[in-house]
């Protein structure tokens, strides 16, 4: 995968040199290029200006971003604009992006964008209903969530397919050594070695956590007969 990032602050992306994303780059599975579009600004070096019609704040000008975009070697990239008004980013969208060969992220850092910039864009994306100073943190979040889904980036596919949201449910509780820590012991079923009982326990706990913390996820989750029976039991146990 090739990722190009248009930003005024390329130094903010230093964390992408490490952990899973850094390893993906070392393996040759990922290429990331940074483009400081201030370098594409005209002689004034100004990348922003006051909006026509008045109003508070500044807008990013179209010219520096268009020129930076034109300088990128590309075929048919997915072009993502980080914008609070965009579609909310989620796991399903990360899985969608992980199938792409080229991604371009446009990160703003002022009041907004000249509307004409959006003619370059295929996707307008937001992390949620809140405002960040710029798009850099949002872009890093999306890149991390996406890159870890690329085949061969993580050793075992189960490492991410069992994650919360990948299955449609929140992840079940997990434990490691020691068995007893400050009086808190590991559930006996996990010590039993009985794989079917462990599977059922994990599924039950996953359903319970989702029901109690994120019931909205269950609206779109297609349940098996076994899961429906478990959920009914969970509802009854927590009906008070």
Swiss-Prot record:
It is found in: Cytoplasm. GO terms for biological process: tRNA N1-guanine methylation. Its EC number is 2.1.1.228. Keywords: Cytoplasm, Methyltransferase, S-adenosyl-L-methionine, Transferase, tRNA processing. GO terms for cellular component: cytosol. GO terms for molecular function: tRNA (guanine(37)-N1)-methyltransferase activity. The keyword Transferase applies. It catalyses: guanosine(37) in tRNA + S-adenosyl-L-methionine = N(1)-methylguanosine(37) in tRNA + S-adenosyl-L-homocysteine + H(+). S-adenosyl-L-methionine binds at residues 108, 127-132. It holds the Pfam family tRNA_m1G_MT. CDD domains: TrmD-like. It is an enzyme of class 2 (transferase). Specifically methylates guanosine-37 in various tRNAs. NCBIfam families: PRK00026.1, trmD. Belongs to the RNA methyltransferase TrmD family. Homodimer. This is tRNA (guanine-N(1)-)-methyltransferase.
């Amino acid at each position: 995968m090739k990722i190009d990032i248009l930003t005024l602050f390329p130094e903010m992306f230093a964390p992408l040199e490490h952990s899973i994303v850094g390893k993906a780059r070392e393996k040759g599975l990922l290429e990331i290029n940074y483009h400081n579009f201030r370098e594409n600004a005209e002689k004034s070096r100004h990348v922003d200006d006051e909006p026509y019609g008045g109003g508070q704040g500044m807008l990013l000008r179209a010219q520096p971003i268009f020129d930076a975009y034109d300088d990128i070697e590309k075929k048919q990239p997915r072009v993502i604009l980080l914008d609070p008004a965009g579609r909310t980013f989620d796991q399903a969208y990360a899985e969608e992006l992980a199938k792409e060969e080229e991604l371009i992220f446009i990160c703003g850092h002022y009041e907004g964008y000249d509307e004409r910039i959006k003619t370059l864009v295929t996707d307008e994306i937001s992390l949620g209903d809140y405002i960040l100073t710029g798009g850099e943190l949002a872009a890093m979040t999306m890149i991390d969530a996406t890159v870890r889904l690329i085949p061969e980036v993580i050793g075992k596919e189960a490492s991410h397919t069992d994650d919360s949201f990948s299955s449609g449910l929140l992840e079940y509780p997990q434990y490691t050594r020691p068995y007893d820590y400050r009086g808190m012991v590991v559930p006996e079923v996990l010590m039993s070695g009985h794989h079917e009982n462990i599977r059922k326990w994990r599924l039950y706990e996953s359903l319970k956590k989702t029901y109690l913390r994120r019931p909205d996820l269950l609206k779109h989750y297609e349940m098996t007969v076994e899961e429906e029976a478990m959920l009914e039991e969970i509802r009854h146990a927590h009906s008070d």
